[in-house]
């Protein structure tokens, strides 16, 4: 059964900032990157445990996928049959709060 995908407000803001940064130089590349990121995230609705456990958090329900150059951190809410995208940030940056 597919999980429902939701986006935390912080993750939505992250996307907006990432798109703005890329689109500043190339709007088409910005749209292309966001589309490919959404495509990668969509797979989590069917395979929520496909991402690795985030080493910094060591919590089996907090996982991540890498969509270069970004880390997409998400939480599996099994009781609610839901995957919440918590944050999206450039992998070279420090860890933001969830």
Where are these regions (language model features)?
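Basic/aromatic recognition patch in beta-strand/loop cores that engages polyanionic ligands
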Residues: 49-79
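Residue-level signal for beta-strand positions within conserved beta-sheet cores that form or flank
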Residues: 1, 60-61, 81-84
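Residue-level signal for pocket-adjacent positions within structured domains
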Residues: 48-52, 90-93
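Enriched for short, Lys/Arg-rich terminal
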Residues: 67-98
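Short proline/glycine- and basic residue-enriched helix-capping loop/turn segments at helix->loop/beta transitions
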Residues: 45
